[in-house]
């Protein structure tokens, strides 16, 4: 469970399904407003330690967006008191004028006063909806970027001497899918295909840095090697080089 302050008036709380279960809640509980849900909201606010700007602010509005694996709760400060007092409605007519009003006129006047009083809340809700749309767009963009990541990387290393190539092969302990050996312009080129899908994002850079301790990183592409280079080993090159005494 984590909290993010989006603005002076809005917080976003992300709650995983596991967190919900630990607190005896499920997504269905949010579909119909109930006392249990409200108690849960205020309990997590106490647990997460609200910013000082949200303390003692009166009424809070909650907006829930269920997701497949989590629930996003947007919390907005309200500028209207939960218990409306006629004394707060300063633009209401005085008692003499009220006495001369018909019931319809009184209701219309009261509705206008309340509408003016709640204008800030309406704007807050509209702002919250815009924030929610932006959050969803950002999440979608991040998911699309993640899906476009290639699960495999080809590393291409260059060696001036065959002995250096063999020495490097004997240092390789990381997992690889396959490897190839080419010769072009009196140099040896080793291609190594690595599956990075289940590794943390820094792994490819870390692996390249480790390879550079023993070899030169090449900017020659695999397609160039395939077209102009001489294929010495078309697969499992590293494993075969490791067998050389």
Curated annotation (Swiss-Prot):
GO molecular function ontology, one term from the record: protein-macromolecule adaptor activity
Gene3D superfamilies, sorted: 3.30.70.1950
Pfam families: MecA
Record note on quaternary structure: Homodimer.
UniProt note: domains: The N-terminal domain probably binds unfolded/aggregated proteins; the C-terminal domain interacts with ClpC.
Family that this chain belongs to: Belongs to the MecA family.
Role, per record: Enables the recognition and targeting of unfolded and aggregated proteins to the ClpC protease or to other proteins involved in proteolysis.
UniProt-listed PANTHER family: ADAPTER PROTEIN MECA (PTHR39161), ADAPTER PROTEIN MECA 1 (PTHR39161:SF1)
Protein name: Adapter protein MecA
Organism: Streptococcus pneumoniae serotype 4 (strain ATCC BAA-334 / TIGR4)
Gene label: mecA
């Amino acid at each position: 469970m984590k909290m993010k302050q989006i603005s002076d008036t809005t917080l976003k709380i992300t709650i995983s399904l596991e967190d919900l279960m630990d607190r005896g809640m499920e997504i269905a509980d949010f579909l119909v407003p109930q006392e249990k849900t409200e108690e849960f909201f205020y309990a997590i606010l106490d647990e997460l330690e609200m910013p000082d700007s949200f303390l003692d602010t009166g009424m809070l509005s909650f907006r829930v967006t269920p997701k497949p694996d989590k629930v996003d709760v947007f919390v907005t400060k309200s500028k209207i008191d939960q218990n409306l007092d006629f004394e707060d409605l300063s633009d209401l007519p005085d008692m003499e004028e009220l006495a001369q009003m018909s019931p319809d006129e009184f209701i219309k006047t009261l509705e206008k006063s309340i509408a003016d009083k709640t204008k800030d809340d309406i704007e807050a809700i509209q702002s919250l909806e815009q924030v929610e749309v932006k959050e969803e767009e950002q999440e979608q963009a991040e998911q699309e970027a993640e899906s476009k990541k290639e699960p495999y990387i080809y590393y291409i290393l260059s060696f001036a001497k065959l002995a250096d190539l063999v020495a490097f092969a004997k240092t390789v302990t990381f997992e690889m899918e396959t490897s190839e050996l080419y010769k072009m312009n009196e140099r040896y080129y080793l291609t190594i295909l690595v599956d990075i899908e289940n590794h943390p994002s820094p792994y490819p850079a870390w692996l390249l840095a480790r390879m550079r301790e023993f070899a030169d990183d090449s900017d020659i592409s695999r397609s160039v090697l395939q077209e102009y280079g001489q294929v010495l080993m078309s697969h499992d090159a590293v494993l075969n080089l490791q067998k050389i005494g």
